[in-house]
């Protein structure tokens, strides 16, 4: 399994700078910028661009769902590190509340439940005026080092291990 990038936290436990410096894949393609990333709260933003819109000119629902999954996943992963675990999403339930065409989106995720084997995180996406445009819950399964995932062995590293 591909190893996740090494992360170094600031003294306050905020991993945002490290996440932004190692942006890749979907996060990079969507232009996601982390403002805060701790085991208790994750905040990320993106500036709406043409590739975020569907044919009616509004932000595609997949962008909202993906943004919710991203902030919840980062928080759940950071919380799991304390147990030397990793996480994988089991379900994402996103509700679209208001259409938005332009400006900045901000997503905030916080844990609802953090157990030994599962976590549930809730997230809200707001527009530049602070109006809620989407909300969702994501449920995660905790993985131990050595577990199998999609035919590969899970490797778990601490926050500053390379």
Could you describe each region identified by the protein language model?
Residues 1-162:
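Terminal targeting signals and extreme-terminal segments of soluble enzymes
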């Amino acid at each position: 399994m591909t190893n996740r990038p090494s992360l170094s936290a600031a003294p306050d436990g905020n991993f945002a700078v490290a996440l932004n410096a190692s942006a890749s894949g979907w996060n990079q393609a969507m232009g996601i910028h982390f403002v805060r990333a701790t085991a208790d709260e994750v905040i990320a933003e993106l500036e709406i661009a043409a590739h975020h819109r569907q044919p009616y000119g509004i932000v595609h629902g997949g962008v909202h769902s993906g943004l919710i999954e991203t902030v919840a996943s980062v928080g759940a992963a950071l919380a799991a590190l304390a147990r030397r675990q990793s996480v994988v999403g089991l379900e994402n339930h996103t509700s679209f509340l208001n259409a938005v065409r332009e400006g900045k989106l901000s997503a905030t995720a916080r844990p609802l439940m953090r157990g030994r084997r599962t976590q549930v995180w809730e997230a809200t996406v707001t527009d530049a005026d602070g109006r809620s445009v989407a909300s969702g819950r994501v449920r995660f399964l905790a993985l131990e080092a050595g577990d199998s995932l999609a035919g590969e062995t899970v490797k778990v590293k601490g926050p500053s291990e390379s």
